[in-house]
Amino acid sequence: GSSFPRRGDKEYIRKKTEEVFYDPKVATNELVDRVFEIANNRITILKLLGYAKSAIRHNMANDIPKIKKQTCLIWGAEDKVTPPHVAEEFHKLLPNSELNWIPLCGHAAMWEHPKRFSEIVLQFLKNKF
């Protein structure tokens, strides 16, 4: 599709990397360089494509409710890669889940809001274990 990186086009890679975040400034030059490097590594790209194809072939919707363990979902409220309605669906399907929203956050909450992300994880672990 149109979201697959054009490997040699660094500005395209920058644009797509920025789209992952609510705040495009999180996509630093260093991060864009790393994504560009990954996009130009044939072996890595083939593995990523394999994972993507597997995810498409194996819809987990029927298996997710079988997960009985306590589950902490952390979602960027402005995630455009995996939109918030997917978080709501996962939350409904996971019988022992809690859904935590991080406002002003896109797809990669652990990078965009690492402190808040860590606080949520630590609180979940303290409450559950």
Language-model features, listed with the residues they occupy:
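Conserved alpha/beta-hydrolase catalytic His-Asp/Glu region
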Residues: 7-66
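Generic recognition of short, well-ordered alpha-helical segments
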Residues: 62, 85, 112-115
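Short, conserved loop/helix-junction motifs that constitute active-site signature segments
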Residues: 65-68, 93-94
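Short beta-strand/loop motif that positions the catalytic acidic residue
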Residues: 67, 73-75, 79
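Conserved alpha/beta-hydrolase "acid-adjacent" motif
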Residues: 80-86
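Active-site-adjacent alpha-helix of alpha/beta-hydrolase-fold enzymes
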Residues: 88-97
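Catalytic active-site module of serine/aspartate enzymes centered on a nucleophile-bearing elbow/loop
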Residues: 96-129
